Amino acid sequence: MNNTPRRLLIAGGGTGGHLFPALAVAERWRERYGLHSVHFIGGQRGLENRLVPNAGFTLETLAVGQLKGKGLPHKLRTLGGLLPAVWQARGMVQRFDPHVVLGVGGYASAPAMVAARSLGIPMALHEQNARAGLTNRLLSHLAQQVLVSFNGVCAQFPGRACQLTGNPVRQALAAVPPLQIPTLFTPQRPLRILVFGGSQGASIFTQRVPEALLPLAQHGAPIQVTQQVQEADADALQRRYQEGGIEAITTPFIEDMATAYAQADLVICRSGATSVAELAATGRPSIMVPYPYAADDHQAANAQALVSIQGGWMRRQEQFHSAWLEAFITSLCMQPAQLQRAGEIARSYARPNADMQIVTLLASMVKMKR
């Protein structure tokens, strides 16, 4: 551990896509600079309220809302609340007195970054997706460095100092052993499928995945499933798999994602930036179904990073039918080497040192002046 005091403030959150990379960086910074060297500013309703304290970090929250998709009155109220949120954030920033700030996106990042800029604190902004959002494109003008996760994204920040770092993943995920696909799936060594749909699950997976897998099991295909599902559907889906002869675990939240990835031969998931980074880090082949309502269709762009190098497969939601999935998994069972190859290619895309690269860059910014 470095004994030189260095305090990092991380601003933003809301979803796992913003938080998990932030936590990966926070863990590395804490290793280098000590227990109380990281502080978070987030929103009052986001996942940060559970994940940040559980990871052992301090968190303060701002009353800031969402601008998109909730009607003009809501947007006007949100805009009206931004100035008070900036003043609230300014007090939080002054109390923690950080040496450097990292913005990670989410609604709380804007007032916190504006406050930090007003205090002359060096800042970096991390863009997780292959298509930068409007908020981050605007906030990039407050930051001295923009850090991106995908090739080509720096072009979306013209005139800004920009570096490709990759998207940090938690250390436990980076340590998942390489994929080892058998030459033949058997009852003793079945095809193991991991299904998840983000922090709220994905109802289309709850419907279509069992519709595809149960006929395969009836024809003797050896399959195991671990599936994240909305809490209201977990018990019914568990019974459905059990009655169809498939060994399955259905759960609203997968606590140990590293073990879940380690045990998976195939992943079926959305293609948020964190999921794509985790698929690469763990070297797991995947069928990615982009969330169709993601801003600027950024999930499809994220998935394309792996699809373009044959490190996974993408299927649009309107084309993700159970008959197609049944046929596709049948082909994978007949040719397991396809899974091995896709997993190895996916792992070649990983940037396992993204967290350390970001920490080193942030540390170098401490003495920078605007």
From Swiss-Prot:
InterPro entries: GlcNAc_MurG, Glyco_trans_28_C, GlycoTrans_28_N. Its EC number is 2.4.1.227. It is an enzyme of class 2 (transferase). The keyword Ion transport does not apply. Keywords: Cell cycle, Cell division, Cell inner membrane, Cell membrane, Cell shape, Cell wall biogenesis/degradation, Glycosyltransferase, Membrane, Peptidoglycan synthesis, Transferase. It holds the Pfam family Glyco_tran_28_C. UDP-N-acetyl-alpha-D-glucosamine binds at T15, G16, G17, N129, R170, S199, I254, Q299. One of its GO terms (molecular function) is UDP-N-acetyl-D-glucosamine:N-acetylmuramoyl-L-alanyl-D-glutamyl-meso-2,6-diaminopimelyl-D-alanyl-D-alanine-diphosphoundecaprenol 4-beta-N-acetylglucosaminlytransferase activity. GO terms for biological process: carbohydrate metabolic process; cell division; cell wall organization; lipid glycosylation; peptidoglycan biosynthetic process; regulation of cell shape. It catalyses: di-trans,octa-cis-undecaprenyl diphospho-N-acetyl-alpha-D-muramoyl-L-alanyl-D-glutamyl-meso-2,6-diaminopimeloyl-D-alanyl-D-alanine + UDP-N-acetyl-alpha-D-glucosamine = di-trans,octa-cis-undecaprenyl diphospho-[N-acetyl-alpha-D-glucosaminyl-(1->4)]-N-acetyl-alpha-D-muramoyl-L-alanyl-D-glutamyl-meso-2,6-diaminopimeloyl-D-alanyl-D-alanine + UDP + H(+). GO terms for cellular component: plasma membrane. Pathway: Cell wall biogenesis; peptidoglycan biosynthesis. The keyword Coiled coil does not apply. Its main location: membrane. It is found in: Cell inner membrane. It comes from the Bacteria. Belongs to the glycosyltransferase 28 family. MurG subfamily. Cell wall formation. Catalyzes the transfer of a GlcNAc subunit on undecaprenyl-pyrophosphoryl-MurNAc-pentapeptide (lipid intermediate I) to form undecaprenyl-pyrophosphoryl-MurNAc-(pentapeptide)GlcNAc (lipid intermediate II). PANTHER family: GLYCOSYLTRANSFERASE (PTHR21015:SF22), UDP-N-ACETYLGLUCOSAMINE--N-ACETYLMURAMYL-(PENTAPEPTIDE) PYROPHOSPHORYL-UNDECAPRENOL N-ACETYLGLUCOSAMINE TRANSFERASE 1 (PTHR21015). This is UDP-N-acetylglucosamine--N-acetylmuramyl-(pentapeptide) pyrophosphoryl-undecaprenol N-acetylglucosamine transferase. It comes from Magnetococcus marinus (strain ATCC BAA-1437 / JCM 17883 / MC-1). The gene is murG.
